[in-house]
Regions:
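Flexible, glycine-rich active-site loops centered on histidine and acidic residues
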Residues: 65-102
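Conserved active-site "lid/cap" helical segment
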Residues: 1-12, 97, 140-184, 195-204, ...
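Acidic-glycine-rich active-site phosphate/pyrophosphate-binding loop
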Residues: 23-37, 76-89, 139-143, 196-208
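Short glycine-enriched loops at secondary-structure junctions
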Residues: 19-22, 78, 129-132, 191-192
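Short coil/turn connectors at secondary-structure junctions
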Residues: 8-12, 38-42, 66-72, 97-98, ...
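Short beta-strand segments
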Residues: 17, 47, 72-78, 112, ...
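Claisen-condensing/thiolase-fold acyl-transfer catalytic domains that form or cleave C-C bonds
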Residues: 20-22, 34-39, 46-65, 162, ...
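Condensing-enzyme catalytic core mediating Claisen C-C bond formation in acyl metabolism
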Residues: 88-159, 163, 250, 262-263
Length: 263
């Protein structure tokens, strides 16, 4: 809010979009509203695994485009460490738990508001895909017991990403008439070095310097991965107003999403 020059009272919508929740009911967005004192805001949660942030941005952007609101907040705070177990009884259990061993805890937020006439900033294009045939590949069970831990098949997640994400990146770049030289940074979901290498470097042929990689510092912080990386890139001076950015998400489900935006 401070960076955007926005007062809490001016927020019209608050969307909380994390994997983790503070309570089952009510929506975490109400807790955020109370802590901010943003009592003019319509509050709700949006759950879409690690794609929560870009999905919430898409929804809020649609609210603004339709005239429902002028200004809103997308916020995520994920404590993924609670879904990690080191108590594995077999090689299979270890394999299914292995992706959780890079989980971190983190949070981020973004303000979206209607652009002024002549301003070319904001979301310029988006693409989303859902393939429910992969839903069993990455799961946190809805049970209150010592079995409520993240389990996944890393090879199947990578296969889904390689199957679906390249087409989304190409679709958004074509829609915007961007080539790789136009893009300042590509900010992917920070999931694993192997997926980044196979997807962006080998399949899409992207140069390494175009991929912003915060994984070594923060690990996989779920739906917070992209806002954390975006904020870090801004703080490091790697992005400035007017720069073109691709946000590229992949999540359990399997879900894929790409947003082309101008800072």
């Amino acid at each position: 809010l401070k960076n955007a020059g926005v007062a809490p009272k001016d927020l019209e919508v608050i969307i909380s979009c994390g994997v983790a929740r503070d309570v089952e009911e009510p929506a975490t967005a109400y807790i955020i509203q109370e802590k901010l004192g943003a009592y003019n805001a319509y509050c709700f949660d949006l759950a879409n695994a690690c794609n929560g942030f870009i999905s919430a941005m898409d929804v809020l952007d649609s609210f603004i485009a339709s005239g429902r609101c002028e200004l809103g907040l997308v916020a995520v705070g994920d404590i993924l460490s609670q879904y990690v177990t080191w108590n594995t009884s077999s090689k299979r259990d270890l394999h299914l738990s292995s992706m959780s061993y890079t989980f971190g805890d983190g949070g981020g937020a973004a303000i979206l508001q209607r652009i002024k006439n002549g301003d070319e900033g904001g979301i310029r294009a988006r693409w989303f895909l859902s393939d429910g045939s992969y839903w069993r590949v990455a799961v946190i069970p809805l049970i209150d017991s010592d079995r409520r831990y993240f389990k996944s098949n890393a090879a199947n997640i990578e296969a889904a990403a390689l199957e679906h994400v390249p087409g989304g990146v190409e679709t958004v770049m074509k829609a915007l008439n961007w080539d790789i030289n136009d893009i300042a940074l590509i900010i992917p979901h920070q999931v694993s070095a192997q997926i980044i290498e196979n997807l962006f470097y080998k399949r899409l042929g992207m140069p390494q310097e175009k991929i912003y990689w915060s994984f070594p510092d923060h690990g996989n912080v779920g739906a917070a991965s992209m806002p954390v990386a975006l904020c870090a890139a801004l703080a490091e001076g790697k992005l400035t107003p007017g720069d073109k950015v691709l946000l590229v998400g992949g999540s359990g489900g399997f879900g894929a999403g790409v947003i082309g935006l101008v800072i």
